[in-house]
């Protein structure tokens, strides 16, 4: 008797080589972890650590402390992807994200968040101190749950209020080194806190229709683009003022003052340019520059510290 095979009964299998599937999974993990954003947060935490009084901790211990902060920050980003997956699927900028696209299930993503979050917390408990671990956990809860689950959907001031969680890394870096709270690192927190609204409002101006479609009450959606442009200029000026304070209290020297002044002059110029000629190009130009601004500002802080000027 001839053997017959029902071709319809044959289930398709993944023919991609294992190395390709592993690479794709790694790319998805990096995407839901917001690797580039977390790298920026770790940079600011590192500068906070570097500016703290030297207590003789080794570089290896400092590295593990920063890694712990980074892993908890990445866990918060993953939770954000899960909570926002339905919103992300409605927005052109985010609809190809792994969870929104269905490449990773919510359960898979949350399991990944739990693993890296627990690992980061243990690192901070063992190689930093309890205060750093608790503060970093609070920052995770603030971003992943208070901001993402509530504030983002509730008020046009979502970025202003929720920005505190994302501004914490310099304080976390400082506390990981000293084990104590201090006034000085709060100035660095205030810089990021003040930087956050114009950074995100510039993006929201360029992507207003996306946010409106997803029913996210960003400022340009609820109050209009013209009012939002005015707020961007106002916060840009406020940012320039806040950035002077590390120099005024002796936390930094002339290199920082000159560098910060130049960066903020460009920031204000681009904000005014957006105010006078608002379109997607000017909005995205400010958004992209704001990322460079924050990164270079903190690098200058570090250089200034170690040149002792």
Swiss-Prot record:
Recite the UniProt keywords alphabetically. Cell inner membrane, Cell membrane, Heme biosynthesis, Membrane, Transferase, Transmembrane, Transmembrane helix
Stretches that traverse the bilayer: 35-55, 59-79, 107-127, 131-151, 159-179, 186-206, 238-258, 289-309
> Keyword Membrane on this protein?
yes
Which Pfam families does the record cross-reference, listed alphabetically?
UbiA (PF01040)
Write down the EC number. Answer: 2.5.1.141
Q: Domain of life, per the record?
A: Bacteria
Q: Does the keyword Cytoplasm apply?
A: no
Q: Where in the cell is it found?
A: Cell inner membrane
- What is its membrane topology? Multi-pass membrane protein
* Molecular-function GO terms, alphabetical: protoheme IX farnesyltransferase activity
Its main localization is membrane
Q: In which pathway does it act?
A: Porphyrin-containing compound metabolism; heme O biosynthesis; heme O from protoheme: step 1/1
Q: Which InterPro entries match?
A: Protohaem_IX_farnesylTrfase, UbiA_prenyltransferase, UbiA_prenylTrfase_CS, UbiA_sf
BP-aspect Gene Ontology terms: heme O biosynthetic process
Q: Which NCBIfam families match?
A: cyoE_ctaB, PRK04375.1-2
The miscellaneous annotation reads: Carbon 2 of the heme B porphyrin ring is defined according to the Fischer nomenclature.
Please describe what this protein does: Converts heme B (protoheme IX) to heme O by substitution of the vinyl group on carbon 2 of heme B porphyrin ring with a hydroxyethyl farnesyl side group.
Stated family: Belongs to the UbiA prenyltransferase family. Protoheme IX farnesyltransferase subfamily.
Q: What is this protein called?
A: Protoheme IX farnesyltransferase 2
Originating organism: Pseudoalteromonas translucida (strain TAC 125)
* Gene from which the chain derives: cyoE2
């Amino acid at each position: 008797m001839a053997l017959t095979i029902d071709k319809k009964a044959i289930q398709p299998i993944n023919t991609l080589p294992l190395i390709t599937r592993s690479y794709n999974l790694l790319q998805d993990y990096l995407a839901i972890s917001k690797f580039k954003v977390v790298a920026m947060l770790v940079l600011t935490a590192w500068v906070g650590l570097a500016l703290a009084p030297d207590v003789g901790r080794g570089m290896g211990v400092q590295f593990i402390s920063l890694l712990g902060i980074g892993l908890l920050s990445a866990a918060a980003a993953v939770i954000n992807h899960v909570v926002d997956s339905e919103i992300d699927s409605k927005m052109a900028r985010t609809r190809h994200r792994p969870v929104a696209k269905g490449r990773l299930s919510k359960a898979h993503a949350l399991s990944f968040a739990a693993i890296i979050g627990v690992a980061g917390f243990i690192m901070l408990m063992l190689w930093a101190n309890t205060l750093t671990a608790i503060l970093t956990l609070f920052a995770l809860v603030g971003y992943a749950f208070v901001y993402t689950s509530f504030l983002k959907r509730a008020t046009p001031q979502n970025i202003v209020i929720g920005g505190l969680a994302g501004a914490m890394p310099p304080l976390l870096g400082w506390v990981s080194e000293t084990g104590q709270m201090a006034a000085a690192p709060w100035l660095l927190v205030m810089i990021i806190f003040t930087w956050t609204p114009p950074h995100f409002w510039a993006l929201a101006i360029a992507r207003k229709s996306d946010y409106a479609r997803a029913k996210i009450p960003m400022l340009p959606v609820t109050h209009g683009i013209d009012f939002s442009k005015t707020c961007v200029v106002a916060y840009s000026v406020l940012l320039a003022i806040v950035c002077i304070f590390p120099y005024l209290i002796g936390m930094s020297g002339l290199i920082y003052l000159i560098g910060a002044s130049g960066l903020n002059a460009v920031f204000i110029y681009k904000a005014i340019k957006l105010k006078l000629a608002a379109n997607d190009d000017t909005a995205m130009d400010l958004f992209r520059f704001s990322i460079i601004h924050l990164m270079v500002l903190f690098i200058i802080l570090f250089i200034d510290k170690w040149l002792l000027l």
